[in-house]
Swiss-Prot record:
Ligand binding (prenylated FMN): 175-177, 189-191, 194-195
Natural source organism: Alcanivorax borkumensis (strain ATCC 700651 / DSM 11573 / NCIMB 13689 / SK2)
Residue positions of the active site: 287
Biological pathway: Cofactor biosynthesis; ubiquinone biosynthesis
Role noted for this protein: Catalyzes the decarboxylation of 3-octaprenyl-4-hydroxy benzoate to 2-octaprenylphenol, an intermediate step in ubiquinone biosynthesis.
Enzyme class: lyase
InterPro entries noted in UniProt: UbiD, UbiD-like_C, UbiD-like_N, UbiD_bacteria, UbiD_Rift_dom
GO CC term (a single one): plasma membrane
Sequence positions that bind Mn(2+): 172, 238
Documented EC number(s): 4.1.1.98
Protein known as: 3-octaprenyl-4-hydroxybenzoate carboxy-lyase
Classification lineage: Bacteria, Pseudomonadati, Pseudomonadota, Gammaproteobacteria, Oceanospirillales
UniProtKB keywords: Cell membrane, Decarboxylase, Flavoprotein, FMN, Lyase, Manganese, Membrane, Metal-binding, Ubiquinone biosynthesis
Entry superkingdom: Bacteria
Length: 491
C-alpha cells in the first residue's frame, strides 16, 4: 500500500476497515490505554479518538496493533512480503561483488532505486503551517496520554527524535519516550549507546557548555517512523529507507530554529535544545515489561518552538505487558531480521522473537546443524551481529525439524535434547536494558544460551534417540479412509 503521509495512511486504513473513529469523549488519562489495550488484544483496528476529554486535538492510537498494519505501514500488503524487504536490507548491508556482466546488470536497478530515494528538501511544508514561539509554547495543550495509574505523568510515546552529531552529515532518527514536566520541558529518555545519546556526548566533547539542538517530529508518516526502528545499514539513511518503503522520496523541511531536517508532512514538530547539566528524574512509568520502571536521571529537552499542521492529529501509544505495539512490531520485524541473519549465517532457517518475551528479550533460532558446537556459534552470532539483539537475554537454538514459532515444538526440543549443564551457556557482565530490574546492576547483566539441537559425536558419548515418525504410506491410506471411520474430531 502506497501513501503520502499519516493522513493518507489513516484514510486508506479506514477504507480497508482497519481504522475506527471514536466520537464518544475519552480521557487521555488512563481511559485511552484501557480501550487500546482491549482492542489490540482482540486484533482490532487502529483508533482515532476525535473527542479527547479536555483537548481539541484528535488522538490516533493502536496504529501498529496488528502485524498486517505494520506491513501496510512499510508499503507492503502482507507480513510475508516483509521477507523480501529483509532480503533487500541484507543485500545493502553487505553487497556482494557482481559475478559477471549479467549479474552486474541485474543488480543495477537495485542500486539505482536506492540512489533515487535520497530525500527531497523543500523550502516549506505542512508541518510549519502554524508556528508557536515564546509564551505560546504550551505542551499541556497536547492530549498527551497518561498510560498507567502510578505513572509519574503524561508521556510522549511516539516521538521521532532527530539529532546530528558534530562533523556529521547524516542525521540520526530514534524513538525515545519523553516525560512532560513543564509547559516547554520534556525529559529525553535515551540509553547511552543509542544514536541520539552518542550525538549528544560528542557534541558536549567538542562544544563544551553549548546547548545541543534537537527536533522531535510527532505524527510522521508510518514509513519514516518504522524506518527509525528497522536495522537500516549505516550506508543508508533512515529517510532514504522510508522513501523505499513508501515508493516516493521523503520530503523534508529545514527547521526554523536549527539546521535539522524534519519530515515535511509531520503533524507536529518540537524544536529546542538540551542544555548542559540540565537533568531531571524520569519515571516511574509502566513499561513494555509489564512493570513500572525505576526512576533515573536523563537530559531535559527545552522546547522553544512548536510548529504544526492545520487541524493536527496527535499520534500516541502505550506500553505494557505483552502484547502491546512494541511486541507486535517485534513479531512483524521477524520477517525482516531472518534474511539479514541468514546473509551472515546461511545455516539459519528461521528466527523468532516471541511477543511474550517483551519484544526482544528472548529469541528462538532454528538451523541446519553442520558440526559439533555449531549451535553455540549461532548463539554468539545473534548477540553480536545486529545491535537490535544486544539486550536479548535468552537465545534458544533448535534443529530445523522444530517450528521456532510453536512453543509446543520448542519445549519438546528443550526437554528431550538438552542437558542443563552441558547445553546451557552463561555469559556474565553483558549489556542489558536499563529497564530490566532483574539484572543485578542497571544496564549490566547476564545472558543464557540454550542448545536444544540433536547432539553430535564429540558433544555426547551416548547413542542419540531417533525421532518417531509414521510410515508415509500408512498416513496416506488413513487419510483416504478417514471419512468412512465416523470419528468426529474438532476442527
Amino acid at each position: 500500500m502506497k501513501y503520502r503521509d499519516l493522513r493518507d495512511f489513516i484514510s486508506q486504513l479506514e477504507q480497508l476497515g482497519e481504522l475506527k473513529r471514536i466520537t464518544v469523549p475519552v480521557d487521555p488519562k488512563l481511559e485511552m490505554t484501557e480501550i487500546c489495550d482491549r482492542t489490540l488484544r482482540a486484533g482490532g483496528p487502529a483508533l482515532l479518538f476525535e473527542n479527547p476529554v479536555g483537548f481539541g486535538t484528535p488522538v490516533l492510537g493502536n496504529l501498529f496493533g496488528t502485524e498486517r498494519r505494520v506491513a501496510l505501514g512499510m508499503g507492503r500488503d502482507s507480513v510475508a512480503e516483509l521477507r523480501e524487504l529483509g532480503e533487500l536490507l541484507a543485500f545493502l548491508k553487505e553487497p556482494e561483488p557482481p559475478k559477471g556482466f549479467r549479474d552486474a546488470w541485474e543488480k543495477l536497478p537495485v542500486f539505482r532505486k536506492v540512489l533515487s530515494m535520497s530525500p527531497k528538501v523543500s523550502s516549506s511544508g505542512p508541518c510549519q503551517e502554524k508556528v508557536l514561539e515564546g509564551d505560546e509554547v504550551d505542551l499541556y495543550k497536547l492530549p498527551i496520554q497518561t498510560c498507567w495509574p502510578d505513572d509519574a505523568g503524561p508521556l510522549v510515546t511516539w516521538p521521532l527524535v532527530i539529532t546530528r552529531g558534530p562533523n556529521k552529515e547524516r542525521q540520526n532518527l530514534g524513538i525515545y519516550r519523553q516525560q512532560l514536566i513543564g509547559r516547554n520541558k520534556l525529559i529525553m529518555r535515551w540509553l547511552s549507546h543509542r544514536g541520539g545519546a552518542l550525538d549528544f556526548q560528542e557534541w558536549q566533547q567538542q562544544h563544551p557548555g553549548e546547548p545541543f539542538p534537537v527536533s522531535v517530529a510527532l505524527g510522521a508518516d508510518p514509513a519514516t517512523i518504522l524506518g527509525a526502528v528497522t536495522p537500516v545499514p549505516d550506508t543508508l539513511s533512515e529517510y532514504a529507507f522510508a522513501g523505499l518503503l513508501r515508493g516516493s522520496k521523503t520530503e523534508l523541511v529545514k527547521c526554523i530554529g536549527n539546521d535539522l531536517q524534519v519530515p515535511a508532512s509531520a503533524e507536529f514538530v518540537l524544536e529546542g535544545f538540551l542544555y548542559p547539566g540540565d537533568m531531571a528524574d524520569e519515571g516511574p512509568f509502566g513499561d513494555h515489561t509489564g512493570y513500572y520502571n525505576e526512576v533515573e536521571r536523563f537530559p531535559v529537552f527545552t522546547v522553544e518552538r512548536i510548529t504544526h499542521r492545520r487541524n493536527p492529529i496527535y499520534h500516541s501509544t502505550y506500553t505494557g505487558r505483552p502484547p502491546d505495539e512494541p511486541a507486535v512490531l517485534g513479531v512483524a520485524m521477524n520477517e525482516i531480521f531472518v534474511p539479514i541473519l541468514k546473509k551472515q549465517f546461511p545455516e539459519i532457517v528461521d528466527f523468532y522473537l516471541p511477543p511474550e518475551g517483551c519484544s526482544y528479550r528472548m529469541a528462538v533460532v532454528t538451523m541446519k546443524k553442520q558440526y559439533p558446537g555449531h549451535a553455540k556459534r549461532v548463539m554468539m552470532g545473534v548477540w553480536s551481529f545486529l545491535r537490535q539483539f544486544m539486550y536479548t537475554k535468552f537465545v534458544i537454538v533448535c534443529d530445523d525439524d522444530v517450528n521456532a514459532r510453536d512453543w509446543k515444538d520448542v519445549i519438546w526440543a528443550m526437554t528431550t535434547r538438552m542437558d542443563p549443564a552441558r547445553d546451557t551457556v552463561m555469559i556474565e557482565n553483558t549489556p542489558i536494558d536499563y529497564l530490566d530490574f532483574a539484572s543485578p546492576v542497571a544496564g549490566l547483566g547476564s545472558k543464557m544460551g540454550m542448545d536444544a539441537t540433536n547432539k553430535w559425536a564429540g558433544e555426547t558419548t551416548r547413542e542419540w534417540g531417533r525421532a518417531i515418525a509414521m510410515d508415509p504410506a500408512v498416513k496416506t491410506r488413513v487419510d483416504e479412509m478417514w471419512s468412512s471411520l465416523g470419528i468426529d474430531t474438532p476442527e
